[in-house]
Amino acid sequence: MLNQNSHFIFIILAIFLVLPLSLLSKNVNAQIPLRRHLLSHESEHYAVIFDAGSTGSRVHVFRFDEKLGLLPIGNNIEYFMATEPGLSSYAEDPKAAANSLEPLLDGAEGVVPQELQSETPLELGATAGLRMLKGDAAEKILQAVRNLVKNQSTFHSKDQWVTILDGTQEGSYMWAAINYLLGNLGKDYKSTTATIDLGGGSVQMAYAISNEQFAKAPQNEDGEPYVQQKHLMSKDYNLYVHSYLNYGQLAGRAEIFKASRNESNPCALEGCDGYYSYGGVDYKVKAPKKGSSWKRCRRLTRHALKINAKCNIEECTFNGVWNGGGGDGQKNIHASSFFYDIGAQVGIVDTKFPSALAKPIQYLNAAKVACQTNVADIKSIFPKTQDRNIPYLCMDLIYEYTLLVDGFGLNPHKEITVIHDVQYKNYLVGAAWPLGCAIDLVSSTTNKIRVASS
């Protein structure tokens, strides 16, 4: 009897012990994916940024930890993909413009975990190319892109996040991105670097100024402030930023052709005879009988930049724009985009390296050589010159030198950093505004998205 009772008690105890364990194991299995889901939301965030530039469209996918430190995606610090031409090339076919982004959208969805896509913000910033389209062409393209994102993507986006990026936004994002990568954000403004971003349609200058300079800042003629107050990495900055529309590298060519009163242009290489198309307008490209001249090209470029335009304030750059007053925030300068690209084609920059120290005078010296060379011989001297840039090499080099020296007031022998990428930890990160946009977007939207989704 005792043995039977013992056996019965043993069975009851076994059932009693096993039952909670089985229930507990079911609860654990149910919580594991939930816990993983919550942890991933708390510890990492993604942002998808489309850069719809004048020469092409690019997508950047960034991954951040909870402190907005960049985390790798695969073997790289970001996912990047590009396509050509830019959206503005589809001015008469908005749907084709939107469809040109499909490969980029597919690529982004391939790297962001599916469970995070609904709370991953997506923003498209169109820059100078779309700004210059006439009528409602730009808005029709943007609406087609909004429809694409809404119908074919699971990313979190809003109509106002697919828009033409204001030039000052572009400049401030670039400044934030480069200073973030250099580890300058959070430090005194004197430790930050100025940025000059020479795009295709516009050029942006941005740098931090003192409180004293901020107090004296004049009002821009268009009503927009010259200075933005930014709070980044627990530090307040007075950020001078201005975007010069129509003064990017490609738009600058058009301005120089407009400034020429003759059919021939002293900036065109000898042997050139054709047309340059920009913004829906064709410009005659023909060198004078004596060939191009760097001196006459420089005079024409100064005229195109409106260097001598009336300045109603204390100090101006060009075209009557306030220069920000200078100061320690402009002591160091990082110049990007076409400054690197053109510099690489004439040997100022070695493309084996993500950046290089250079001086404005080097662009002038290269121009002196290019301007006295026949279009058929330019490759023998500058073999890395892209074929599409050959007719304009003299013009481009003179333009960049004049922009830096006469426009922004740099000493011809001042050493600046010309960059394509920035070394960040063990990675190279592209010097572009999308990173600054991503930092701003993630920090301002992540909590809102979570609350709305819960």
From Swiss-Prot:
What residues bind ATP, as annotated? 48-58, 194-204
Q: Provide one Gene Ontology cellular component.
A: membrane
Recite the lineage of the species: Eukaryota, Viridiplantae, Streptophyta, Embryophyta, Tracheophyta
Q: Which PROSITE patterns does the protein's record reference?
A: GDA1_CD39_NTPASE (PS01238)
TM region positions: 8-28
**Membrane topology, from the record:** Single-pass type II membrane protein
Source domain of life is Eukaryota
Q: Which reaction does it catalyse?
A: a ribonucleoside 5'-triphosphate + 2 H2O = a ribonucleoside 5'-phosphate + 2 phosphate + 2 H(+)
The enzyme class is hydrolase
Its post-translational modification remark reads: The N-terminus is blocked.
Q: Where is the active site?
A: 170
Native source species: Solanum tuberosum
EC number(s) in its UniProt entry? 3.6.1.5
Q: What is this protein called?
A: Apyrase
Pfam families on file: GDA1_CD39
One GO BP: nucleoside diphosphate catabolic process
Gene Ontology molecular function: any one: apyrase activity
Q: Where would you find this protein in the cell? A: Membrane
Task: Give a short account of what the protein does.
Answer: Catalyzes the hydrolysis of phosphoanhydride bonds of nucleoside tri- and di-phosphates.
The cofactors required by this protein are:
Ca(2+)
Q: Which residues lie on this side of the membrane: Extracellular?
A: 29-454
Keyword vocabulary terms for this entry: ATP-binding, Calcium, Glycoprotein, Hydrolase, Membrane, Nucleotide-binding, Signal-anchor, Transmembrane, Transmembrane helix
InterPro entries on file: GDA1_CD39_NTPase
Family of the protein in this entry:
Belongs to the GDA1/CD39 NTPase family.
Give the positions annotated as glycosylation sites: 151, 262
